[in-house]
């Protein structure tokens, strides 16, 4: 409700350099999309509940159902049609509904009365506050990036969005999926105060991620142009747009592995019930990013914004492991680096070979 009342002020900050027509369209879409927030929030809660119940695949099924709704909407409406925004809301509502049905099947019971005297509420509030701050800070970071990008030519924000989503989908597919599976083991080892066992699982997790992500990242950088041409090079997406997006995509890829490392480190912090460390990491990441946005965008324009994002993520990933070392004295940072070197070197050799073949 507050967003709807103050939407012009908020959108003015978010998209300062937009034209009048673009602002009008953004305003129309935002008023509709905002109603998906309750469904997204509820979806996240029930997703966590089902993961605890060892029903991790249900959230993937719910996502597929929401994608089906969006695809049907795309077939029935024009891409610029405002009905597409309502379809997005409908997709989130349907995915939440699917999770809710499975949650009831797993024994979930709804109590309409909230008792503030329950002991776990205080513990939950203490733990969730740093997570809440981290989320707010991350959103501020996103707004800052869009604010600076809105000052450049039309289509830059779109290219940055496409490049970001395509590159960091690697992180979503690889590290997020792995951490979802491993998180219960992390929390079990942390609850038993078995730091040696927790660190052993951490090293294995890093090993799996590095052997998977490094080849994809370096290979993606080498053949960035053909990838963007294949995925986005159709319709109104011109050759110049493909080149711009390919350059953005290549730079964003450099931040994928640091993002994976940061994601894993944040989950270890949560397992150790030190969510404050994740909050400090988020603050460091955003601080570095905004500083570099200001410094690099003046000389390198939009590419400077992309470099700023990658460097900030790297700073955050380094910070989270340094902080983890302060609470887990058995953690070997040397072992963490060791798990990264071999797959990086071999992936780099692979990338050089692919580049030579491509240039022949």
Tell where the protein language model's regions lie, with residue ranges.
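Transmembrane alpha-helical segments of multi-pass transport proteins
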Residues: 338-360
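Alpha-helical transmembrane segments of multi-pass membrane proteins
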Residues: 19-45, 237-265, 280
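Helix-loop junctions and terminal segments of transmembrane helices
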Residues: 1, 176-194, 202, 265-266
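Alpha-helical transmembrane segments of multi-pass membrane transporters/permeases
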Residues: 35, 46-75, 254, 261-294, ...
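Interhelical loop/hinge segments that connect adjacent transmembrane helices in multipass membrane
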Residues: 100-138, 196, 326-341
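Alpha-helical transmembrane segments of multi-pass membrane transport and lipid-handling proteins
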Residues: 1-13, 203-235, 243-260, 290-291
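Transmembrane helical elements of multi-pass membrane transporters/channels
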Residues: 91, 95, 99, 118-188, ...
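Hydrophobic alpha-helical transmembrane segments
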Residues: 61-72, 79-105, 284-289, 302-323
């Amino acid at each position: 409700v507050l967003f709807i009342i103050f939407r012009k002020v908020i959108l003015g900050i978010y998209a300062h350099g937009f034209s009048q027509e673009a602002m009008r369209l953004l305003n129309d879409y935002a008023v509709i999309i905002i109603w998906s927030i309750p469904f997204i929030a509820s979806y996240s809660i029930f997703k966590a509940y089902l993961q605890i119940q060892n029903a991790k695949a249900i959230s993937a099924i719910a996502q597929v159902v929401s994608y089906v709704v969006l695809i049907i909407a795309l077939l029935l409406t024009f891409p610029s049609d405002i009905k597409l925004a309502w379809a997005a809301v409908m997709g989130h509502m349907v995915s939440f509904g699917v999770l809710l049905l499975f949650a009831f099947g797993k024994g979930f019971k709804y109590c309409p009365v909230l008792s503030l005297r329950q002991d776990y509420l205080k513990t939950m509030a203490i733990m969730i506050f740093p997570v809440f701050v981290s989320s707010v800070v991350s959103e501020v970071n996103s707004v800052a990036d869009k604010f600076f990008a809105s000052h450049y030519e039309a289509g830059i924000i779109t290219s940055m969005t496409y490049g970001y989503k395509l590159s960091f989908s690697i992180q979503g597919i690889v590290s997020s999926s792995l951490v979802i599976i491993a998180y219960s083991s992390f929390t079990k080892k942390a609850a038993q105060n078995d730091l040696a066992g927790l660190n052993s699982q951490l090293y294995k997790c890093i090993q799996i991620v590095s052997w998977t992500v490094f080849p994809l990242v370096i290979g993606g950088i080498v053949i960035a142009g053909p990838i963007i041409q294949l995925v986005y090079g159709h319709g109104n997406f011109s050759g110049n747009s493909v080149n711009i997006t390919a350059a953005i995509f290549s730079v964003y890829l450099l931040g994928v592995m640091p993002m994976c490392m940061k994601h894993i480190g944040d989950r270890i912090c949560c397992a150790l019930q030190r969510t404050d460390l994740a909050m400090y990491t988020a603050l460091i990441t955003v601080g570095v990013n905004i500083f570099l946005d200001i410094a690099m965008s003046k000389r390198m324009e939009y590419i400077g914004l992309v470099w700023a994002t990658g460097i900030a993520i790297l700073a955050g990933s380094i910070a989270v492991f340094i902080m983890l070392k302060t609470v887990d004295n058995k953690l070997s940072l040397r072992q963490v680096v060791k798990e990264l070197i071999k797959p990086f070197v071999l992936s780099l050799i692979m990338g050089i070979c692919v580049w030579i073949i491509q240039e022949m």
